[in-house]
Amino acid sequence: QPNAELVTDPIERVEAGGVRTKDGRLHELDVLVLATGFDGHSFMRPMDLIGRDGVDLKDVWAETTQAHRSISLPGFPNYFMLVGPNSPIGNFSLIDISERQLGYIMQLIELWRGGTVNEISARQDAADRFNASVKDAMGDTVWVTGCQSWYLDKHGNPAMWPFTFDKFCDDMSVPDLDE
């Protein structure tokens, strides 16, 4: 638009009349928008993570970013993450969510340490059920009613937790070894 300009030059300083860039030019403005290029769907990246049979996480998440219970991935044994895809970080306390996820993960690690299991990896069918339930529960919530935002991936799959805090607490209380 004629009344808008995208300026990508390095900023020298912000002044009362606008923003002065390193080239000495003063850009008069009414609004200053600082865009950092945040990508809400780049969980764990740019880290290289290779799972069973040489599968690369970048390939697994090339189309959509999903995980089982927001903490584990089928085909990536003994790998866990905090605040992964569909973690309820937009509607609850990040600290409380992280602590509950860590408690769940520690229970799984204790099962491994105690010899109950040799490895821990989410089953694909369990992850598929979890992700389908998340998508179904979004229904007509504000996150999926037509606005494009970081709450949705490029295919419209939700990145948020659509359930209650109580359900999250229940889901993080005791590991289900059938999953």
Question: What residue ranges belong to the model's regions?
Answer:
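Flavin (primarily FAD) cofactor-binding/catalytic cores of flavoenzymes
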Residues: 1-93, 99-114, 174-178
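C-terminal, flexible cofactor-proximal segment of oxidoreductases
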Residues: 67, 80-179
